Design a protein with these regions (language model features):
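Hydrophobic alpha-helical membrane segments
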Residues: 1-271
């Protein structure tokens, strides 16, 4: 397995490929994303363990969407069963994916525990259990500190797991190694990933502003309230479609030349 170092402009290419692939199979990719959201939402309804279970399922579910994108790039219509690809790859890989999910859940819950030390658990409770967000709560200094601490700590966690599910599934890498390789790939391609992330933040912000402006022009504030949610889900579906390309261009399969669980570094120029 070879790690490709890509130029910064590749970040924009990943975004474009996300839109292009989504438009090739809009019905399939939208449907799978909604199934993805429904699966995690249903998991959270289970008493006591719901939130942890949803977190543990997230790496496998994300892998399912990546597999769907891969199918779409081949001109195929991804079927609903592709969402559980991680659990159809043999006992060894299923076990590895479950371990990866458990590590992700543990890491996230540790972050929530740290945030609870800052504000007494207000932010963590709101995030994991839900509840009403009031202006008074948001203005609390401890709540804001807990929120920013969570965001700061989640960044390294997300980088550790960014490529990990795909490495486990497609390259047979062990969970611990997949975390290391994922972090290394994100570090080596930090410029492309930064451009990629900034582009998506820009797309989200501009889209929300456009919807708000349209509502203002129409003189109908209810339009914004009704449109923001489905439009936000649409953008999220395209975002998840694009994630596969960040993995595809970062790693090259060289299993015929060397062990697939070893890694070498090479300069690359995917466009």
């Amino acid at each position: 397995m070879k790690l490709n170092i890509v130029p910064a402009r590749t970040g924009l290419t990943w975004v474009k490929l996300g839109f292009k692939t989504y438009l090739q199979q809009p019905l399939a990719m939208s449907g799978l994303f909604f199934m993805f959201m429904a699966l995690l939402s249903i998991a959270t309804l289970i008493p006591l363990i719901g939130a942890a279970l949803a977190l543990a399922l997230l790496p496998a579910a994300t892998l399912g969407l990546m597999a769907a994108t891969q199918e779409a790039t081949k001109g195929k219509f991804p079927m609903p069963t592709i969402l559980i690809s991680a659990f159809r790859a043999g006992k060894q890989q299923v076990r590895a994916m479950l371990v990866l999910g458990a590590l992700y859940a543990a890491g996230f819950l540790i972050i929530m525990a740290i945030s609870a030390l800052i504000d007494g658990g207000g932010f963590a409770r709101l995030y994991l259990v839900g509840g009403k967000i009031t202006e008074d709560v948001v203005r609390q200094t401890d709540f804001q500190l807990a929120m920013w601490a969570t965001l700061a700590l989640y960044l390294p966690l997300s980088l550790l797991f960014w490529h990990a599910p795909a490495l486990v599934h497609w390259h047979g890498v062990t969970p611990v190694k997949s975390l290391f390789f994922s972090l290394m790939a994100c570090y080596k391609n930090w410029a492309a990933l930064t451009i990629y992330g900034m582009a998506w933040v820009g797309i989200f912000v501009v889209t929300m502003l456009v919807v708000t402006v349209i509502a203002a022009v129409l003189g109908n504030p209810a339009f914004a309230a009704l449109a923001l949610f489905p439009v936000g889900l649409l953008i999220m579906a395209i975002f998840f479609t694009s994630i596969y390309f960040t993995f595809r261009d970062s790693f090259t399969d060289t299993s015929t030349e060397e062990s697939s669980t070893d890694i070498s570094v090479a300069e690359g120029d995917p466009t």
